[in-house]
A protein has these predicted regions:
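Active-site rim helix/loop that mediates acceptor-substrate recognition in acyltransferases
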Residues: 44-63
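Acyl-donor (CoA/ACP) binding surface of acyl/acetyltransferases
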Residues: 1-38, 53, 66-181
């Protein structure tokens, strides 16, 4: 893990490395059928626990993984947003999963903007993608706000290979050109 661990700050949010204390909120998100609709469905607590540990481990092994997203005003965990690249994944992704209570407030785009800046500047990525279900209109809107465009259908690794996705993407050059405007 980078030392010190990264912490990003936006106008309303703090993005930090996940920790054990995030588990109950993380499990609530994993148990919410509406939130998990495009992410493989509801997950039992044991699976959520393994995923949290894998995310924390990824920070130590790879130096990146999704951040925990905390509202500054309440100190409340509202989701996870950030860089990921699983084995067999179609590219270097900035992904987002927010608790339903946090939907519709611009938090996903705000956090993903900070995470994208970080991935391009600190990780040196040349491109980011977002793997989005064709009928996930809300995530498509977030991708558009970030400046990403739909590149076409994508192929996910097992166990997600049965779920069709569209790849949205943009290059580092496109990102920084838009940010400079």
């Amino acid at each position: 893990m980078p030392s010190p661990p990264p912490m990003l700050e936006t106008a309303r949010l703090i993005l930090r490395v996940p920790c054990r204390d995030d588990f109950e909120a993380w499990a609530a998100v994993g148990g919410d059928a509406e939130v998990m609709r495009y992410l493989g469905g509801v997950q039992p607590r044991f699976t959520v626990w393994k995923n949290l540990l894998a995310t924390i481990g990824s920070w130590h092994v790879l130096g990146f993984a999704p951040f925990s997203v905390i509202r500054k005003d309440e100190g409340q965990w509202i989701g996870r947003v950030g860089p990921l690249r699983h084995a067999g994944w179609p590219g270097t992704e900035i992904g987002w999963t927010l608790a339903r209570a946090a939907w519709g407030r611009g938090y996903a785009a705000e956090a993903a903007t900070a995470a994208t800046d970080w991935a391009f500047t600190k990780l040196g990525w040349d491109e980011i993608i977002h793997c989005i279900a064709a009928d996930n209109i809300a995530s498509q809107q977030v991708a558009r706000k970030l400046g990403s465009v739909k590149r076409g259908p994508g192929k996910m690794p097992a166990p997600y290979d049965e779920e069709p996705v569209e790849i949205w993407a943009q290059s580092r050059e496109e990102w920084f050109a838009r940010r400079a405007q």
